[in-house]
Amino acid sequence: MTAIDPQGLEKHTPMMRQYLTLKAQHPDMLLFYRMGDFYELFYEDAKRASELLGISLTARGKSGGDPIPMAGLPYHAVEGYLAKLVQLRVSVAICEQIGDPATSKGPVERKVVRIVTPGTLTDEALLQERQDNLLAALYQGKTGYGYATLDVASGRFVITELANTEALEAELQRTNPAELLYSEDFSEMSLIAAINGTRRRPEWEFDYDTCHRLLLNQFGTKDLKGFGIEDARLSLQAAGCLMQYVKDTQRTALPHINSIVRFNQSDSIVLDAATRRNLELTVNLQGGRENTLASVLDNTVTPMGSRMLQRWLHQPLRDHDIIRARQVSIEELLGNANYEILSEDLKAIGDIERITTRIALRNARPRDFARLRQALALLPQLQQTLTQAAAPHLKYLSQVIGEFPDELELLSRAVVDNPPMLIRDGGVIREGYNEELDQWRKLSEGATDYLHELEAREKQQTGISTLKVGYNRVHGYYIEVSRRESDLVPLSYQRRQTLKNTERYIIPELKEHEEKVLSSQGRALALEKQLWEQLFDLILPKLHELQDFARASAELDVLCNFAERAESLNYHCPDLSTAPGIQIEAGRHPVVEQVSQSPFIANPVTLNNERKMLIVTGPNMGGKSTYMRQVALITLMAHIGCYVPAEHAVIGPVDRIFTRIGASDDLASGRSTFMVEMTETANILHNATPNSLVLMDEIGRGTSTYDGLSLAWSAAEYLAKHLQAMTLFATHYFELTQLPELLSNVENVHLDAVEHGDSIVFMHAVQEGAASRSYGLQVAALAGVPNCVISAAKHKLHQLESRDHGKESCDAQQPLQQSISFSAPTPSPALEALAKLNPDELTPRQALDYLYNLKKLAL
């Protein structure tokens, strides 16, 4: 059987009919079907789970005449398997036994009690603690796109309206959703093809009236005007679909989702998808997280602070007032070194943001409450440090963080110091919190003393030295005697079980005690679970304040982190200016300087109305791309409030950062390297403004020399003359160095290098003026290109240069198409002798003689 057919249920066994009915309700998910101590999967689910999880595929009899493929996994190990499936973007429906097997006629009643999808995770074990886990929904309208994201683990709900595919692509890359819902009428499938975890939803789920009503019900408001989103029709349709999906999967109230924010692209510096990729903000070009800007800047002490920092990196602000408030806060934290004290306190606070959400969803575990108690206990100490702050923003954060003395007192009374992982077996509620619970526990715990007394008494009365009292879940309490002493057992003992070396018995007194003990244990556990549920009710009224406390603590963590990074890495506070331009003195690349084995060479840059474009030339590997990227990264860092790796920086208004650096074939879309390059260039030429920072690196490659040169020249001229964008334009077309002679706002700069014979030393220093040459052959030699190829290339280079200069030499008159000789270069006796020389073994006299001999060989 390869397909599940709910219509033909009558031919299956009762259990399989139950399974198939439940599976039909969750066709796109793996169904974990509880069978005793295992979760079992059948049919195609079993085959898929076997492949994804590496578990055995077997068969479970037949149903409907066909073998049933089956795979199983232990219930106690389910979280590990769920974590693996979530990473693979696979959703799971978990079906539990909710009926009593003892009273059930036919299959035990079962129900799907939990749905785990990649975008709706809240369980600590399934989440990456330092990364947001976003569920997104996308709706396409006639005027653009509506896009909504929700971090279920924090309640952060954001919508935005996007005018075109370029903006949508950038937003998808910025948010990087774990799961994406899209309507069945969505037409731009190439934009979402690379996203794992996409879910196609019926068009009616995006109905505006239904979505609008859903959101009103969630927020408990009469309209959405208070959120400023009433006119965002497309994104409200996306948000409504998303909200319904979360309700369906969580199957509980969602009180932590209590607001919605509209993200306006005009509030932040626009970074398109290519720019985010090329600048390696949080993910490097290979898809990893090492050697990124985040890897250098993120020394936060809380997971929620780390997540906030990454959001800031992808959303640099344009509002100078907010940026300056952050700068002033960092300055004060540095001035009195309070960031060190605050960071120690924040480290102990942990991830309150996600703990608060689990409390709101009523799926928090005992240790979540213990961590919340620990965090609340630290607040007086944290506030004592913050009260010394003069910076207005630090005062504001102190006010928002607040204190929670009543909740701290409650948790201190209610929860033991080191609670178990789960409430299932009790032991969570502290002694003294509830008098009735204490009484039931005493009755239960007193059983142990009684059993010891009974065992000692029976040993003495019977004379059986091996007699002992035991317990198991099947037979309850029993008296165990070795087989060799079983003839001493009194007639009043009733045999319960015979084992290989022992006999087990019961007596009426022990049975009566068992009933009392089990009754007291059961009542104690039931009451403890009831008190546990009441804890949620007592904490939830403070939910909003706890969420604010978490967000403010995360921001304080980021600011303390920026202070630490500034001091540790020698960063300085940039000046924000209303005058256009970017001026950086002794700027450094924040990532390269950390991974470089040699001292980083700092370089300046000046861009203003009189100097809008810099034509950057110099050798391959000379540092052109590094130089350009560092200007963009310093500019971006300045706009998140961070200090920057420069002696001094003045940054004017910036609305966008564009990068056209490097390219590769887009095989999925069937686009060549050159096509990708031209598409990115077109985007820049259509959207750049005088306040945009543009990085253009080596455009025009991948086509003929004259085509490439013409395109590069025209693009540079258009940027400088018509758009007047702040541009760094790196090129190997030396003809472009003539642009400053034609345009007054263009200048030449170059990366310096020193040639020594056939070798080259890169100085990595930016100098005014154009480079004299590109040193391509020297770089090729450094890369290990065979000497014969280098020699042939030198010959061809001389031939080309001779022709270009109109020389009448024999070489110049030879056709360029002539065959190149790749014979090895003639050996040099002088070089061979020099290679065999060990200078440490020579006396001064021998060295002088050797030098004369080398000169003769060279001649």
From Swiss-Prot:
Keyword DNA damage: yes
Signal sequence extent: none
CDD domains: ABC_MutS1
Biological processes per GO annotation: mismatch repair
Keywords: ATP-binding, DNA damage, DNA repair, DNA-binding, Nucleotide-binding
One GO CC annotation: cytosol
Coiled coil: none
Cross-referenced PROSITE patterns: DNA_MISMATCH_REPAIR_2
Binding site for ATP: 618-625
Name of a matching Pfam family: MutS_V
Functional note: This protein is involved in the repair of mismatches in DNA. It is possible that it carries out the mismatch recognition step. This protein has a weak ATPase activity.
UniProt record similarity statement: Belongs to the DNA mismatch repair MutS family.
HAMAP family from the UniProt entry: MutS (MF_00096)
Record protein name field: DNA mismatch repair protein MutS
Organism: Shewanella halifaxensis (strain HAW-EB4)
Name of the gene: mutS
